[in-house]
Curated annotation (Swiss-Prot):
An annotated GO cellular component: plasma membrane
Keyword Ribonucleoprotein assigned: no
Primary subcellular site in the record, as a coarse category: membrane
Lineage: Eukaryota, Metazoa, Chordata, Craniata, Vertebrata
Organism name: Gallus gallus
Name of the featured protein: Radixin
Gene Ontology BP term (one): regulation of organelle assembly
Length: 583
């Protein structure tokens, strides 16, 4: 029995290991991978490997793995990657696994600067990446530095601006807060919707020359073929939609494209190597097939996948709504518990205050009782003193009468008696004055005693009302694409041809009517403009790249991806081919 061959396949988020037989085909290995990851939208993907010469190449599905020029390692190394890109991610990427794989691959390409992304857009994209990883922003959990270990921005952007890690985090966090309530998978899709409007998204670039020998770039993407000047990969100069192309072929390094317009000449260019032409042909065929498929009614399989995806999304939304509802209920219960605890504390404090007031009133009552007793004693003393004085006065009166009688009887000792009389008269006057004072004093004590008695009665009434008040209520209880493939390594097979059919397709060039995602959202557009102005203040102009300069010129001229697409397809096919030859 032949010895099995170990194979390692790296997806964007996993490493898979298989043992295959020497006669296993590329398709059998591919099918094993997609089955393992649960992927049904297989037409976008392929298996990539590095050949014996160090070139990155796509595995042929119709050939045995062992018959292809895979670098000899143990295990054999492959990457599972998107080979073709959708025109509109929101319309075409159905399964969540497909969306995630595209999100991770596009994010890596942007961070590695394989796709040019301006700084302000890079910050917006980073915020969607953060939402997809961390979910909703929560200031209790996401403290300062929560993004310190995440790679979120291209190195070029970091080096061009005099901003600290904390300042970058603050800008990303501001947008992260705005994505509250967005599902993680929805944030990946929002990332892709912004990213697909970047000029270099989904484009495979190949160095070519026209008949004059001018060095140019050929861009092959989901919408057609575009020609770029050698120093500008951002702005295509001439475009040919797939619907204009009838046949593609190559002979050695010469590549020929025959337009549907019979009056137009062939579109001819030259690649540096035969293997490049083979790769261009395979990409053209795959992209053309997908371009035409999109413009036809969905197959039963795609319809079923879309229905299933809608059902799964609806179910997730229901689950999330239920979760949010439970969360709100829990928050309400916690708030109610806090409110009850607070009211309980307030009632306890009120009870404590009432107890203090009761004790204070009790002390005041005792003090007033003591004071009333003292006043009563004073009143009694004053009364006794007044009675004593009254007795003395009466005694003096009696003495006076006796003396008067004695004076009448004894005229002979008149002078002596007169003196005694005067003395007693003066004494009587003094005693009367003292009596009057004591009577006034007794009256005053009498008033004070009455006032104290009234205060005492009042305090007794207050104490009685406090003591008889009902106790505070207890707190309520807590409620808690057929592949016509060509072997890039087979140098003998130096020519090939493919017919590109456009039968049964309506509205060929609908892509020319598109606008970018930011143009659809005025608020995001203004935020991006504001952030762009802000970042410009911190930018080191000496570190600008060629792409930065080109992007700035495009923005200044009002050129967007789809506006440029409309412009480079203007005129008939012949005019554009003539323009290409003149470059």
């Amino acid at each position: 029995m032949p010895k099995p061959i170990n194979v390692r396949v790296t997806t964007m988020d996993a490493e898979l290991e298989f043992a295959i037989q020497p006669n296993t085909t590329g398709k059998q290995l591919f099918d094993q991978v997609v089955k393992t990851v649960g992927l049904r939208e297989v037409w976008f993907f392929g298996l990539q490997y590095v050949d014996s010469k160090g070139y990155s190449t796509w595995l042929k599905l119709n050939k045995k793995v062992t018959q292809q020029d895979v670098r000899k390692e143990n295990p054999l190394q492959f990457k599972f990657r998107a080979k073709f890109f959708p025109e509109d991610v929101s319309e075409e990427l159905i399964q969540e696994i497909t969306q995630r794989l595209f999100f991770l691959q596009v994010k890596e390409a942007i961070l590695n600067d394989e796709i040019y992304c301006p700084p302000e857009t890079a910050v917006l994209l980073a915020s969607y990446a953060v939402q997809s990883k961390y979910g909703d922003y929560n200031k209790e959990i996401h403290k300062l530095g929560y993004l310190a270990n995440d790679r979120l921005l291209p190195q070029r952007v970091l080096e061009q601006h005099k901003l600290t890690k904390e300042q970058w985090e603050e800008r990303i966090q501001n947008w992260h807060e705005e994505h509250r309530g967005m599902l993680r998978e929805d944030s990946m899709m929002e990332y892709l919707k912004i990213a697909q409007d970047l000029e270099m998204y989904g484009v495979n670039y190949f160095e070519i020359k026209n008949k004059k020998g001018t060095e140019l770039w050929l861009g092959v993407d989901a919408l057609g073929l575009n020609i770029y000047e050698h120093d500008d990969k951002l702005t295509p100069k001439i475009g040919f939609p797939w619907s204009e192309i009838r046949n593609i072929s190559f002979n050695d390094k010469k590549f020929v494209i025959k337009p549907i317009d019979k009056k137009a000449p062939d579109f001819v260019f030259y690649a540096p190597r035969l293997r490049i032409n083979k790769r261009i042909l395979a990409l053209c065929m795959g992209n053309h097939e997908l371009y035409m498929r999109r413009r036809k009614p969905d197959t039963i399989e795609v319809q079923q996948m879309k229905a299933q995806a809608r059902e799964e999304k609806h179910q997730k939304q229901l689950e999330r709504a239920q979760l949010e509802n439970e969360k709100k209920k829990r928050e309400i219960a916690e708030k109610e518990k806090e409110r009850i605890e607070r009211e309980k504390e307030e009632l306890m404090e009120r009870l404590r205050q009432i107890e203090e007031q009761t004790m204070k009133a009790q002390k005041e009552l005792e003090e007033q009782t003591r004071r009333a007793l003292e006043l009563d004693q004073e009143r009694k003393r004053a009364k006794e003193e007044a009675e004593r004085l009254e007795k003395e006065r009466r005694a003096a009166e009696e003495a006076k009468a006796a003396l008067a009688k004695q004076a009448a009887d004894q005229m002979k000792n008149q002078e002596q008696l007169a003196a005694e009389l005067a003395e007693f008269t003066a004494k009587i006057a003094l005693l009367e004055e003292a009596k009057k004072k004591k009577e006034e004093e007794a009256s005053e004590w009498q008033h004070k005693a009455f006032a104290a008695q009234e205060d005492l009665e009042k305090t007794k009434e207050e104490l009685k009302s406090v003591m008889s008040a009902p106790p505070p209520p207890p707190p309520p209880p807590v409620i808690p694409p057929t592949e016509n493939e060509h072997d890039e390594h087979d140098e003998n097979n130096a020519e090939a041809s493919a017919e590109l059919s456009s039968d049964g397709v309506m509205n060929h060039r609908s892509e020319e009517e598109r606008v970018t995602e930011t143009q659809k959202n005025e608020r995001v557009k203004k935020q991006l403009q504001a952030l762009s102005s802000e970042l410009a203040q911190a930018r080191d102009e000496t570190k600008k790249t060629q792409n930065d300069v080109l992007h700035a010129e495009n923005v200044k001229a009002g050129r967007g991806k789809y506006k440029t697409l409309r412009q480079i397809r203007q005129g008939n096919t012949k005019q554009r081919i003539d323009e290409f030859e003149a470059m």
